[in-house]
Protein backbone atom coordinates (compact mmCIF):
# COMPACT_ATOMS: atom_id res chain seq x y z
CA UNK A 1 0.00 0.00 0.00
CA UNK A 2 1.27 3.46 -0.85
CA UNK A 3 2.21 5.84 1.96
CA UNK A 4 -0.57 8.27 1.13
CA UNK A 5 -3.48 6.69 -0.68
CA UNK A 6 -5.50 9.00 -2.93
CA UNK A 7 -9.20 8.21 -2.93
CA UNK A 8 -11.69 8.60 -5.77
CA UNK A 9 -15.44 8.79 -5.32
CA UNK A 10 -17.49 6.04 -6.94
CA UNK A 11 -21.20 6.76 -7.46
CA UNK A 12 -23.64 4.03 -8.48
CA UNK A 13 -26.95 5.74 -9.19
CA UNK A 14 -28.58 2.50 -10.35
CA UNK A 15 -27.95 0.82 -6.98
CA UNK A 16 -28.22 4.05 -5.00
CA UNK A 17 -24.87 4.33 -3.17
CA UNK A 18 -21.49 6.02 -3.18
CA UNK A 19 -18.12 5.39 -1.59
CA UNK A 20 -14.51 6.45 -1.93
CA UNK A 21 -11.93 3.89 -3.04
CA UNK A 22 -8.16 3.99 -3.70
CA UNK A 23 -7.59 5.66 -7.08
CA UNK A 24 -5.04 3.05 -8.23
CA UNK A 25 -7.42 0.19 -7.61
CA UNK A 26 -9.32 -1.48 -10.45
CA UNK A 27 -13.09 -1.95 -10.68
CA UNK A 28 -13.80 -5.57 -11.64
CA UNK A 29 -16.93 -7.51 -12.46
CA UNK A 30 -17.73 -10.49 -10.24
CA UNK A 31 -20.90 -12.52 -9.88
CA UNK A 32 -22.68 -11.63 -6.65
CA UNK A 33 -20.91 -8.29 -6.20
CA UNK A 34 -22.47 -5.00 -7.23
CA UNK A 35 -19.00 -3.42 -7.31
CA UNK A 36 -15.59 -4.96 -6.61
CA UNK A 37 -12.40 -2.93 -6.30
CA UNK A 38 -9.07 -4.77 -6.32
CA UNK A 39 -5.57 -3.63 -5.53
CA UNK A 40 -3.51 -4.39 -8.66
CA UNK A 41 -0.31 -4.76 -6.61
CA UNK A 42 -1.66 -6.88 -3.71
CA UNK A 43 -3.40 -10.03 -4.95
CA UNK A 44 -6.01 -10.57 -2.24
CA UNK A 45 -6.74 -7.00 -1.14
CA UNK A 46 -10.28 -6.04 -2.15
CA UNK A 47 -13.29 -3.87 -1.37
CA UNK A 48 -16.65 -5.23 -2.48
CA UNK A 49 -20.17 -3.82 -2.35
CA UNK A 50 -23.31 -5.95 -2.43
CA UNK A 51 -26.81 -4.49 -2.75
CA UNK A 52 -29.79 -6.78 -2.11
CA UNK A 53 -33.54 -6.19 -1.67
CA UNK A 54 -34.83 -7.29 1.76
CA UNK A 55 -38.15 -7.39 3.63
CA UNK A 56 -37.02 -5.33 6.60
CA UNK A 57 -36.89 -1.57 7.06
CA UNK A 58 -33.93 -1.40 9.44
CA UNK A 59 -31.00 -3.42 10.74
CA UNK A 60 -32.61 -3.49 14.19
CA UNK A 61 -35.34 -5.75 12.77
CA UNK A 62 -32.64 -8.28 11.86
CA UNK A 63 -30.82 -8.01 15.19
CA UNK A 64 -28.68 -5.87 17.45
CA UNK A 65 -25.11 -4.89 16.64
CA UNK A 66 -23.88 -7.70 18.90
CA UNK A 67 -26.36 -10.32 17.57
CA UNK A 68 -25.37 -9.75 13.96
CA UNK A 69 -21.68 -9.65 14.89
CA UNK A 70 -22.00 -13.02 16.61
CA UNK A 71 -23.78 -14.50 13.56
CA UNK A 72 -21.09 -13.11 11.27
CA UNK A 73 -18.24 -14.64 13.28
CA UNK A 74 -20.13 -17.93 13.58
CA UNK A 75 -20.65 -18.09 9.79
CA UNK A 76 -16.94 -17.37 9.20
CA UNK A 77 -15.92 -20.06 11.71
CA UNK A 78 -17.85 -22.68 9.71
CA UNK A 79 -15.94 -22.04 6.49
CA UNK A 80 -13.69 -24.89 5.45
CA UNK A 81 -10.60 -22.66 5.24
CA UNK A 82 -11.01 -21.16 8.74
CA UNK A 83 -8.85 -22.86 11.36
CA UNK A 84 -10.97 -24.10 14.34
CA UNK A 85 -11.13 -21.32 16.92
CA UNK A 86 -9.67 -18.91 14.37
CA UNK A 87 -12.29 -16.13 14.34
CA UNK A 88 -11.81 -13.02 16.46
CA UNK A 89 -14.11 -9.98 16.54
CA UNK A 90 -11.78 -7.00 16.95
CA UNK A 91 -14.24 -4.08 16.81
CA UNK A 92 -17.93 -3.52 16.35
CA UNK A 93 -19.69 -0.19 16.31
CA UNK A 94 -22.78 1.58 15.07
CA UNK A 95 -22.81 4.84 13.13
CA UNK A 96 -25.31 7.08 11.41
CA UNK A 97 -24.35 8.19 7.92
CA UNK A 98 -23.87 11.90 7.28
CA UNK A 99 -26.09 12.38 4.23
CA UNK A 100 -29.06 10.07 4.77
CA UNK A 101 -28.86 9.28 8.51
CA UNK A 102 -28.86 5.57 7.65
CA UNK A 103 -27.73 3.35 10.54
CA UNK A 104 -24.69 1.24 9.70
CA UNK A 105 -23.19 -1.57 11.75
CA UNK A 106 -19.43 -1.76 11.40
CA UNK A 107 -17.42 -4.91 12.09
CA UNK A 108 -13.71 -5.64 12.03
CA UNK A 109 -12.59 -9.19 12.62
CA UNK A 110 -9.56 -11.38 12.20
CA UNK A 111 -9.51 -14.83 10.63
CA UNK A 112 -6.85 -17.49 10.98
CA UNK A 113 -7.17 -19.52 7.78
CA UNK A 114 -5.33 -22.34 6.08
CA UNK A 115 -4.13 -19.71 3.56
CA UNK A 116 -2.86 -17.19 6.13
CA UNK A 117 -4.23 -14.63 8.56
CA UNK A 118 -6.77 -12.18 7.21
CA UNK A 119 -8.50 -9.01 8.41
CA UNK A 120 -12.07 -8.38 7.30
CA UNK A 121 -14.03 -5.13 7.54
CA UNK A 122 -17.82 -5.11 7.06
CA UNK A 123 -20.12 -2.11 6.90
CA UNK A 124 -23.81 -3.05 6.80
CA UNK A 125 -26.92 -0.89 6.46
CA UNK A 126 -30.58 -1.08 5.41
CA UNK A 127 -32.47 1.72 3.70
CA UNK A 128 -35.68 1.62 1.63
CA UNK A 129 -35.86 -2.17 2.07
CA UNK A 130 -32.43 -2.61 0.54
CA UNK A 131 -29.45 -4.22 2.30
CA UNK A 132 -26.09 -2.58 1.61
CA UNK A 133 -22.89 -4.43 2.53
CA UNK A 134 -19.33 -3.22 2.08
CA UNK A 135 -16.78 -6.00 2.62
CA UNK A 136 -13.08 -5.13 2.59
CA UNK A 137 -10.36 -7.64 3.27
CA UNK A 138 -6.63 -8.16 3.14
CA UNK A 139 -4.14 -10.72 4.38
CA UNK A 140 -1.98 -9.60 7.28
CA UNK A 141 1.56 -8.63 6.31
CA UNK A 142 2.88 -9.62 9.73
CA UNK A 143 1.60 -12.15 12.29
CA UNK A 144 -0.95 -10.35 14.45
CA UNK A 145 -1.51 -7.61 11.87
CA UNK A 146 0.50 -4.99 13.75
CA UNK A 147 3.04 -3.96 11.10
CA UNK A 148 3.05 -0.43 9.69
CA UNK A 149 1.61 -1.74 6.41
CA UNK A 150 -1.20 -3.51 8.31
CA UNK A 151 -1.96 -0.29 10.22
CA UNK A 152 -2.17 1.63 6.93
CA UNK A 153 -4.53 -0.97 5.49
CA UNK A 154 -6.71 -0.74 8.60
CA UNK A 155 -6.82 3.09 8.36
CA UNK A 156 -7.62 2.93 4.63
CA UNK A 157 -10.46 0.42 5.04
CA UNK A 158 -11.95 2.44 7.89
CA UNK A 159 -11.86 5.57 5.73
CA UNK A 160 -13.53 3.73 2.84
CA UNK A 161 -16.20 2.38 5.22
CA UNK A 162 -16.92 5.83 6.62
CA UNK A 163 -17.26 7.23 3.09
CA UNK A 164 -19.98 4.74 2.16
CA UNK A 165 -23.53 6.04 2.10
CA UNK A 166 -26.84 5.58 0.39
CA UNK A 167 -27.79 8.28 -2.11
CA UNK A 168 -30.62 10.65 -1.13
Residue ranges and their predicted role:
Residues 19, 49, 84-85, 156-158:
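A general, composition-driven signal for non-globular sequence regions
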Residues 16, 62-66, 147, 151-155:
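Soluble non-cytosolic domains of exported or imported proteins
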Residues 14-32, 161:
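Proline-anchored loop/turn motifs at beta-strand termini and strand-loop-strand connectors
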Residues 8-11:
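Short amphipathic
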Residues 25, 131-168:
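Surface-exposed amphipathic alpha-helical segments
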Residues 17-20, 99, 126, 152-156:
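Structural motif
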Residues 1-6, 27-133, 138-146:
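Conserved polar/disulfide-associated segments of primarily extracytoplasmic proteins
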Residues 22, 34, 69, 73, ...:
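Extracytoplasmic/secreted envelope proteins and their assembly/folding machinery
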Amino acid sequence: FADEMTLTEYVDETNNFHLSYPTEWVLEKKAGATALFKNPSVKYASIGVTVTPVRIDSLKEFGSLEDIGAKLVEAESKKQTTVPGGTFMERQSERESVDTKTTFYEYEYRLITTHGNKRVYNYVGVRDRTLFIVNAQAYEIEEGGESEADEKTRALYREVGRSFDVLK
